[in-house]
């Protein structure tokens, strides 16, 4: 089993996307990249911890590759806006890839360069994986548990539509 660690705005949205991908065994919402140990959601939202909202993805590389996960990541959030995803503004919503090994770093660098070659101004941070802190239990599988919640209804369906239209070949059998 391999792991990927991505931040692309609100972790509820990113989690909802990656739970649809074949070979993804588990997605854990959490925090990484800051200076506070065991931060709370409230602390991260205040912006003082410097943590990003991230998802830790456990995946089977025999079913989905890290590069394919990168493609999904970049297609389902805005990697060109610094510290912002839609109406969510703050460093906790930054676009970030934390890599666990040199192969992941190189794959991410290649994907970012390909997007830049297409004239996209990518602001995604690329850094070694720091300590990951799981978010509080009520954040886990949030969209699955709260599909009619207002924010979720606004932010997540457009991401899922993009996912379904561009990555049908990577979707879990329903």
UniProtKB/Swiss-Prot annotation:
Query: In its UniProt entry, what is this protein called?
Result: Peptide methionine sulfoxide reductase MsrA
Chain's role = Has an important function as a repair enzyme for proteins that have been inactivated by oxidation. Catalyzes the reversible oxidation-reduction of methionine sulfoxide in proteins to methionine.
A Gene Ontology BP annotation from the UniProt entry: protein modification process
Q: Which GO terms describe its molecular function?
A: L-methionine:thioredoxin-disulfide S-oxidoreductase activity; peptide-methionine (S)-S-oxide reductase activity
Q: Please report a single Pfam family linked to this protein.
A: PMSR
Swiss-Prot/TrEMBL catalytic activity: L-methionyl-[protein] + [thioredoxin]-disulfide + H2O = L-methionyl-(S)-S-oxide-[protein] + [thioredoxin]-dithiol; [thioredoxin]-disulfide + L-methionine + H2O = L-methionine (S)-S-oxide + [thioredoxin]-dithiol
Q: Where along the chain is the active site annotated? A: 10
InterPro entries documented for this protein: Met_Sox_Rdtase_MsrA_dom, Met_Sox_Rdtase_MsrA_sf
